[in-house]
Swiss-Prot record:
Residues 109-205 form the Rieske domain. It comes from Triticum aestivum (Wheat). Its EC number is 7.1.1.6. GO terms for cellular component: chloroplast; chloroplast thylakoid membrane; plasma membrane. This is Cytochrome b6-f complex iron-sulfur subunit, chloroplastic. The 4 large subunits of the cytochrome b6-f complex are cytochrome b6, subunit IV (17 kDa polypeptide, petD), cytochrome f and the Rieske protein, while the 4 small subunits are petG, petL, petM and petN. The complex functions as a dimer. It is a single-pass membrane protein.
Amino acid sequence: MASTALSTASNPTQLCRTRASSLCKPVKGLGFGRERIPRNITCMAGSISADRVPDMSKRELMNLLLLGAISLPTFGMLVPYGSFLVPAGSGSNAGGVAAKDKLGNDILVEDWLKTHGPNDRTLAQGLKGDPTYLVVESDKTLATYGINAVCTHLGCVVPWNAAENKFLCPCHGSQYNNQGKVVRGPAPLSLALVHADVDDGKVVFVPWVETDFRTGDNPWWK
């Protein structure tokens, strides 16, 4: 009896490992039941190289991206056990979540302000695992809003450039002012906002559903 063998060369979609995860798609080749022909594989990088991001170490960026990547697929599995796994008080502010630093620890506002000066913008883990900037005001207080770091063009993480007092996207050149309002395309919209509340000394990110104070418009991210 004849048997049919499944070759990995006939798999229509393959994954490869690079510095940034990439999706590899075959450019040429035949399907099942035909003569095998060597395939050319084209890898299209799905994210940018960390060494192109200014004012932020590679380790910090990769830690935050890894946290976000891990949190999304595991969240659904953990929901039924959330009351056992989430510390008391976490996420109690109308759908809010405790802000996490690059090591995954809760951010204590008093300690944060001791190590982050005026006009600082530093990434934390925010709602849905998105990298989100905590903002320190010029008077050394924590701003009541945080800024989602995901570019509204194609989803790159946008670094803060203190020298230019702007968020500058390294992917396609979009620019945002120091509050995350878009000032140069191709990004069509400003960076999303979240509330940065303080609960029992910890920073808590809460969804922003009110008018965007930067534009006077309803929030596009609702």
